[in-house]
Amino acid sequence: MVLPASMRLRGSRCFEHLQKWGYRFYGTSMVLRVIEANPQLLKAPHRHHNSTACRCAVVISSKVSKRAVIRNRLRRLLHDHLRSRLEVAPEHCNHWVLISLKPVASAIEASPLLEECDRLLNQAGLLS
């Protein structure tokens, strides 16, 4: 299942800001970047719509897999996991999260991948 629109991170300015200034947490198969939300970087229609909520994005390059089916499967898996984890997060969670998968991620089973995602979210302080 995909992330609801209120939880999606959109816009190149948001991604550039996260890439440049976000705190990085490294795992064996992914990199998690976190930064405090900055609603001014959102495009106008999305700026006031739940601007204090956690917003997430998952980036999977073609280096992970040349097959779009595999990349989309991994993206849906992580979207569903992030949605279930961050919906129960505290209301004061006002961070933006970007997950970038490394090329080794396509060879890893789903459960170790999700465990690593949880571990990185815990390191970032987004899960209690």
Swiss-Prot record:
The protein's Enzyme Commission number: 3.1.26.5
Highest taxon listed in the record's lineage: Bacteria
Catalyzed reactions per annotation: Endonucleolytic cleavage of RNA, removing 5'-extranucleotides from tRNA precursor
Residues spanning the membrane: none
MF-aspect GO terms: ribonuclease P activity; tRNA binding
GO BP terms in the entry: tRNA 5'-leader removal
Keywords, alphabetical: Endonuclease, Hydrolase, Nuclease, RNA-binding, tRNA processing
Gene3D superfamilies: 3.30.230.10
UniProt xrefs under Pfam families: Ribonuclease_P
Enzyme class: hydrolase
Family, similarity comment: Belongs to the RnpA family.
Functional description taken from the UniProt entry: RNaseP catalyzes the removal of the 5'-leader sequence from pre-tRNA to produce the mature 5'-terminus. It can also cleave other RNA substrates such as 4.5S RNA. The protein component plays an auxiliary but essential role in vivo by binding to the 5'-leader sequence and broadening the substrate specificity of the ribozyme.
Record note on quaternary structure: Consists of a catalytic RNA component (M1 or rnpB) and a protein subunit.
Protein name in the entry: Ribonuclease P protein component
